[in-house]
Amino acid sequence: MSIYLDNGATSYPKAPGVGEAMLDYVNNVGANVNRSTYATASTAAMILLDTREQLCRLFNFDDPTHVIFTPGMTAGLNMLLKGYLKAGDHVIVSSMEHNAMMRPLIQLEKEGVEFSRIPADRDGIARAEDILPLIRPNTKLVAVMHASNVCGSLLPVKEIGAICRERNIPFILDAAQTAGHYPIDFKELGLSALCAPGHKGLLGPQGIGVMLMDHEFAKSVEPLIAGGTGSASDSEELPPYMPDRFESGTMNIPGVYGLNAALTYILEKGVDHFRAHEEKLTQRFLDGLKDIPVRLAGTEDMAKRVGVIAVDFTGHDNAEAAFALEQMGILTRCGLHCAPSAHKTLGTFPQGVVRFSLGYASTEADVDGALEAIRSIAR
């Protein structure tokens, strides 16, 4: 019997009904959307529309036509960053970012785009006011993650959004570790765009992601991918209207069906339900670590974190610790988590950490089992 504590990588198990919904599409529907008008094609199109509307409800977003399906979180960020930024532009990120943000920016840097990082402290906590000295006349974008995939620390995105609004700077949110886990209000945060994967806190399958863009920002983003949309087929130009402009090619419809089932479950339960559950388990985990000779990388303040817990087995090799945990049935992720800048900020580079990430299906028994295993390795 294993204990799955790698929900920061992907959720498991998926929400009830996800597999069945995907199988229903494959076995009983099978049609593409925007290509034909027969019954099964219309059925699939209605599921896509319903899923866009579900995402509007989840994130308090107004327009389902500006909800874009992507292959995943990384694809969404690439579409936004590479479609918006140009040579001479400056963008502000944080020192906690994942490589899904940083690698596109490193590529763009070679083309004349500059970036600065909001510094976080050794607990992964950043202050919104530290963005102010970084703003330049050519600052065209602020793009940050909502919560660290390494240590779970939350960035002060509401305050950052307010600063961006005051200065008319577009603001992009990477919600990879918070969508489905933590309440997100597109309007309240003053977002220009939001990206999220379908397979983490949204409890859907891999291979499907979402990108929400407000009307003004969408007009400034050039599509990264061009091709067939099933619409405006008399022209070799991309259609000017949404969502078609950003959805060239064949849609991952099985993925959307799975995501639709997952969102139905999340909306029925409410995000606050999942947040409360993970807060309770995270606090239990943090309390249990206090008498074990390991280092917690990240804050103990539950108001400033999510259920991603980074443990440094000081005096031990973290990779060996992760292997020992696996032998005891505790499934985690060890290493640098595609976020070297975050580890440098936390003081855990290059050794990395062992990451325990909780999910909706995690239990107190899972937490206690993990703590017992950590204790046996660390002593």
Where are these regions (language model features)?
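Pyridoxal 5′-phosphate
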Residues: 1-379
